[in-house]
Regions:
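Glycine- and acidic-residue-enriched helix-capping/strand-helix junction motifs
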Residues: 35-47, 172-176
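Periplasmic-binding protein-like
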Residues: 86-98, 118-120, 163-168, 193, ...
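Secretory targeting signatures
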Residues: 1-25
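Beta-alpha junction/loop-to-helix N-cap segments that form part of ligand/metal-binding clefts
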Residues: 23-25, 40-47, 54-130, 139, ...
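Extracellular/periplasmic periplasmic-binding protein-like sensory domains
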Residues: 234-298
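Immediate post-signal peptide segment of exported/extracytoplasmic ligand-binding proteins
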Residues: 19-30, 59-64, 155-162
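Extracellular/periplasmic Venus flytrap/periplasmic-binding protein
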Residues: 81, 125-126, 134-241, 279, ...
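Active-site-proximal beta-strand/loop segments in catalytic clefts of secreted hydrolases
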Residues: 31-34, 70-73, 96-100, 120-123, ...
Length: 298
């Protein structure tokens, strides 16, 4: 919701009074990970976008706001064509994508068409380069900030030098965040398993989980992951008999983690970083309580 509100502020000068009786339609694109590793969060993202469209309609009654949703797939190969579909649909601006690689691919299409985009979740540090990614904005901090914050979190939790392993996907989000965490923590202060890199499509983590269980030094692990892979890793660690402290970034921080787990009690004690509410958070909590389904957003 906050992302769309920021778009409204950006377009406020363009959305002044309209002398025509017929309302002008303003199309806003929305790149949502309907498929892929962040799919469990897609319903929440969509609900928030719909609520924001309702707010915009109240703020600017002379306009009809239309949300055009496309699947980003949490994948550049999906998000690029989706962005072109939004361009062809005549959108003024785009909200998204969630995943960094998807935002990078979409930006190449959208910026070429002169369409700005604002992401609600893409944190790769490289996206801060305005020359490489023109007309890209985000309302979440870069992993250049989240990485050191994660290191501080683990220090405060009592993780000792030489006790931490870092698991990270090799995609734009996972590698960027894992790099930031290792840089802040110190590569020479990792445990004997060290850093483990894997493809986001990997589904078998039993071998690395067995290494963690056999280690005499690895009492903590940081997951630079999404939801689906984090669940598989956590379950593999439990199956191997490892019972240390699990940490993570914003990727596995959503409530979708509970739906993905076969045994959500394994999440007890897991500690993650996540951007806090900003000064423009407004009355979101009250808005959610008044409008969200009683059984939660599914």
């Amino acid at each position: 919701m906050m992302t769309l509100s920021m778009l409204a502020a950006a377009f406020a000068g363009c959305l002044g009074g309209d002398d025509d009786d017929e309302k002008t339609t303003v199309k806003i694109g929305f790149l949502n990970p309907i498929t892929g590793p962040l799919e469990p969060n897609a319903p929440v993202f969509k609900w928030s976008a719909d609520e924001a469209i309702s707010d915009l309609t109240e703020m600017y009654p002379d306009y009809n706001f239309e949300l055009i949703e496309q699947d980003s797939g949490c994948d550049g190969a999906v998000a690029g064509p989706a962005a072109q579909t939004l361009v062809d649909s005549g959108v003024y601006a785009v909200v998204g994508a969630a995943c960094s690689g998807a935002s990078m691919a979409a930006n190449g299409v959208l910026s070429a068409a002169g369409i700005p985009m604002i992401s609600y979740a893409s944190t790769n540090p490289g996206l801060s380069d305005a020359s490489a990614y023109p007309m890209f904005y985000r309302n979440v901090p870069s992993d250049a900030i989240q990485g050191p914050a994660g290191a501080d979190m683990m220090t405060d939790a009592g993780v000792a030098d030489g006790a931490l392993a870092v698991f990270g996907m090799t995609n734009d989000y996972g590698a960027g965040l894992a790099d930031a965490v290792v840089d802040a923590w110190g590569s020479d202060k990792l445990c004997d398993v060290g850093r483990y890199d894997y493809a986001e499509t990997d589904t078998d983590f039993q071998a690395i989980a067995d290494q963690m269980a056999a280690s005499t030094t690895c009492t903590a692990v940081y997951l630079s992951s999404y939801i689906a892979d984090a669940a598989l890793i956590i379950e593999a660690l439990a199956d191997a008999g490892w019972s240390g402290h699990i940490f993570g970034g914003d990727g596995p921080a959503g409530e979708g983690m509970y739906d993905e787990m076969e045994d959500d009690s394994l999440l007890n004690g897991m500690t993650v970083t996540q951007p806090r509410a900003g000064s423009s958070f407004g009355d979101f909590s009250a808005h959610y309580d008044a409008n969200a389904p009683s059984g939660g957003i599914k």
